[in-house]
């Protein structure tokens, strides 16, 4: 990834950064909740974004 990024790439990276976080604590505490963790977590070294 070059140090000079285009704005489009930067926006995509920012979105992926936001997606790559654990689910909020209060969502797990809700009644009838079956979601235990974020199944779509991505590790920076294991899985690359592909752009």
Swiss-Prot record:
InterPro entries assigned to the protein according to its UniProt record, in alphabetical order: Ribosomal_eL39, Ribosomal_eL39_CS, Ribosomal_eL39_dom_sf
A biological process term (GO) from this entry: translation
Protein name: Large ribosomal subunit protein eL39x
Keywords assigned by UniProt, alphabetized: Ribonucleoprotein, Ribosomal protein
An example molecular function term from Gene Ontology annotations: structural constituent of ribosome
Keyword Ribonucleoprotein: yes
Gene: RPL39C
A single cellular component GO annotation: cytosolic large ribosomal subunit
Disulfide bonds: none
Family: Belongs to the eukaryotic ribosomal protein eL39 family.
């Amino acid at each position: 990834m070059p140090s000079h990024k285009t704005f489009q790439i930067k926006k995509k990276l920012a979105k992926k950064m936001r997606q790559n976080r654990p689910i909020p604590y209060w969502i797990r505490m809700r009644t009838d909740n079956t979601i235990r963790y974020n199944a779509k977590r991505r590790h920076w070294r294991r899985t690359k974004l592909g752009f």
